[in-house]
């Protein structure tokens, strides 16, 4: 069951950010193949309009990616839901998110009661995301660092969600995945990417599965303030 968020009036929304509009988004996601009810309830509950610029708030509950500045985007809700649904299948408790961005994916995971660690290379985006987490009463642990390194001090993780695409799965992140854990990440270049899930079995063996074609911004090294 999704924990109740401490929502302020502006979080609940009216008009194009109202509960009715959110319910319509959830039904579209359900029709597009998202089946996990906890995931759908988190999408219904977390106020996506607070994670984007106010000028775009009327589009917050469209099933589309939107710009958040610094050449980055808030992911399409279907993609967020599909990645969340995939990691929930292994019943995780502790999750690493690589690429905080607006904070929306991390908020979805936190709303599901998971222990969330998130890393972002762009300082300005991370500062904004932290404000949103505080506003919603979410205890998300965050770090300004190169996401390709992960956050090994708190590993291993039951699940890892990567929100930017690399040409191949990053070994440093795979190494932080616990036995029985699952990593979900976009893999590929600018012209072709796939959402891939990697599961580490009890014997340590790695199994991979392609979930869907996707389009993400690239996973870059280094840090920006």
Swiss-Prot record:
Its EC number is 2.1.1.77. It comes from Xanthomonas campestris pv. campestris (strain ATCC 33913 / DSM 3586 / NCPPB 528 / LMG 568 / P 25). SUPFAM superfamilies: S-adenosyl-L-methionine-dependent methyltransferases. NCBIfam families: pimt, PRK00312.1. The gene is pcm. InterPro entries: PCMT, SAM-dependent_MTases_sf. Belongs to the methyltransferase superfamily. L-isoaspartyl/D-aspartyl protein methyltransferase family. GO terms for biological process: methylation; protein modification process; protein repair. It catalyses: [protein]-L-isoaspartate + S-adenosyl-L-methionine = [protein]-L-isoaspartate alpha-methyl ester + S-adenosyl-L-homocysteine. CDD domains: AdoMet_MTases (cd02440). One of its GO terms (molecular function) is protein-L-isoaspartate (D-aspartate) O-methyltransferase activity. It comes from the Bacteria. Keywords: Cytoplasm, Methyltransferase, S-adenosyl-L-methionine, Transferase. Catalyzes the methyl esterification of L-isoaspartyl residues in peptides and proteins that result from spontaneous decomposition of normal L-aspartyl and L-asparaginyl residues. It plays a role in the repair and/or degradation of damaged proteins. It is found in: Cytoplasm. The active site is at 75. Gene3D superfamilies: Vaccinia Virus protein VP39 (3.40.50.150). One of its GO terms (cellular component) is cytoplasm. This is Protein-L-isoaspartate O-methyltransferase.
């Amino acid at each position: 069951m999704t924990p109740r968020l401490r929502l302020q009036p502006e979080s609940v929304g009216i008009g194009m950010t109202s509960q009715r509009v959110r319910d319509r988004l959830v039904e579209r996601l359900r029709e597009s193949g998202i089946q996990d009810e906890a995931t759908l309830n988190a999408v219904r509950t977390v106020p996506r309009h607070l994670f984007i610029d106010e000028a775009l708030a009327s589009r917050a509950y469209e099933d589309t990616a939107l710009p958040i500045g610094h050449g980055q985007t808030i992911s399409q809700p279907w993609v967020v839901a599909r990645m969340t649904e995939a990691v929930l299948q292994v019943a995780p408790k502790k999750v690493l998110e690589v690429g905080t961005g607006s904070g929306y994916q991390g908020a979805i995971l936190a709303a599901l009661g998971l222990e969330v660690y998130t890393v972002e290379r762009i300082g300005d985006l991370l500062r904004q995301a932290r404000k949103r987490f505080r506003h919603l009463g979410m205890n998300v642990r965050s770090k300004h660092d190169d996401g390709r390194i992960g956050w090994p001090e708190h590993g291993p993780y039951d699940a890892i969600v990567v929100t930017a695409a690399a040409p191949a799965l990053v070994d440093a992140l795979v190494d932080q995945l616990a036995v029985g854990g699952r990593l979900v990440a976009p893999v590929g270049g600018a012209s072709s990417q796939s959402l891939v899930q990697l599961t580490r079995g009890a014997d340590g063996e790695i199994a991979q599965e392609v979930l869907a074609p996707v389009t993400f911004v690239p996973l870059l090294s280094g840090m920006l303030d």
